[in-house]
Amino acid sequence: MALVEGCKHSLEISIPAAEVETETNRVVLDVQKRAKLPGFRPGKSPASIIRKQFAGDIRQQVLESLIPTHLQKQLEAENLNVVGTPDISDVHFHDNEPLRFKATFEVVPEIELGEYTNIEVPYQDPEVTDEDVTSRIDEIREQKAQYVNIDPRPLADGDFAVVSLESLEGVSGDPVKTDEMQLEIGAKETFEAFNENLRGLSPGDEKDFEVEYPADYGSEKLAGRKVKFHAVVKGLRKKELPELDDEFAQELGDYRTVDELKEAVRKAIFSQRQYEAQQEAKNKIVDKLVDAHEFPVPEVFVERQIRNRVEQSLRAMAEQGVDPSKLKLDWEKVKEAQREKATREVKASLLLGKVSDREAIRATRDEVDAEVEKAARQQRKPVAAVHMEFEKDGTLGRIASHIQTDKTLSFLFERARKTAES
C-alpha cells in the first residue's frame, strides 16, 4: 500500500488471468442464456458470437464483479478503515492477462490519543443575585401586562397609540395598509419618524409623514425604501402590570406565595447560566484537545462538514426572510472560508470518538428511546411509528451519536481541572 498524502492511500491490485477467464466465462454464459439474436433460438447463440456482440457489456460486468470483491478483500487484509468511495484508475484488462487496477481512497487516521483528563479550563458556578430574580419576574409581568384604554389627550412618551396606517408613496404594487397598529411612543423599538410625528397628536387626529426603512428591514416590501404614510390616531392606551402578590404567583403555576415563585425563578436562572457556562467550558476543553493532537483528516469528512455549515447558514438566512439566491455570493469562496473551522470540527469529532472508545462511553437503549418518545410527543404520533421512521432514515443512529458525544463531553468536563475565571 502506498501513502499518497495525508489520509489518502492507494493500492495496486492484480487478479490472476485464470480467475479473470473463469469470471468472463460465467458472464458470457449468463448473457448467452438471455440473448436473443437473429437466426438462433433463445439461449442457443454460440459463445464466440456472444463475446463479440456483447463485448462491452461483458467487460463491464466482469469489472463490476471482480474489482469490488478483490478490493474489499485487500482492504480487510490490510485492516484499512476506508471513508468515501475509492477511485478506480489504471485498469488493465486484456485477454489471457491478469486484470490490474489502482484504487485510491482515504482512510480514518490513526490517532495516538494523548492526555485528555485533567485539562485546565476556566470555570466557576454562576451567581444569581436578587436583582437578577427581580428582573426576570418583571419580564414575566411585562408579558402578562394589560393595555387599557384611557381618556383622549395628546400622546406623550410612554403612551401606547392605536394607529391606522396606509402608504401613499414609496411602495410598489398595492399600498401597505393596517387598520390597527399599537406603538409605544418614545420606545427604542419604535422608528423615530413615528415618535416625532405622532407625539402630541390626540385620538382622532390625522397626519401624513415619511418613514425611511433600513435595507435589512424584515419586510421586503419596505426594506430600503422611503415611504409616505397617512396615519390616523384611533385611541390611547396605558400598560398595566399585574401586582406582584401571592395571587399572581398562583396564576403562574404550582406556587403558593411570591417567595416560592422567586425561589423557582432563581433556580431556573441558575440552571440556564450553569448550562451555558458548562457548554463554554466544554468548547474550550475540545479546543485544547484539538490543539494538542496533530493528525491529518480525510478530505471527504471536511467537505461534508463544509456542506453542513453552508446549509446551516442558508437555513438561518431563510428564517430571517433572506433569499440567498439574490445575494450574488461566490459560493466557492463561501465554502473555502469555512474550511479551517470545518477541519477543526472534524478533528474534534474524531478525537471525541476516540475518547468514547477508550472509556467505553455509549448511548444506552433507554436514552435513545427517551429521545424517540420526546419526538413522538412533539409530532403527536405513536412512538412505534416514529421509531420505525427514525430507524429507516438513519435518525436513530444520529440520535445515538449525539447522545454519545454529549456524554463524552460531560466526562471530559467532570475530569477537567477547573480554575477560577481570570
From Swiss-Prot:
Its EC number is 5.2.1.8. This is Trigger factor. It is found in: Cytoplasm. GO terms for cellular component: cytoplasm. InterPro entries: PPIase_dom_sf, PPIase_FKBP_dom, Trig_fac, Trigger_fac_C, Trigger_fac_C_sf, Trigger_fac_ribosome-bd_bac, Trigger_fac_ribosome-bd_sf, Trigger_fact/SurA_dom_sf. Consists of 3 domains; the N-terminus binds the ribosome, the middle domain has PPIase activity, while the C-terminus has intrinsic chaperone activity on its own. PANTHER family: TRIGGER FACTOR CHAPERONE AND PEPTIDYL-PROLYL CIS/TRANS ISOMERASE, TRIGGER FACTOR-LIKE PROTEIN TIG, CHLOROPLASTIC.
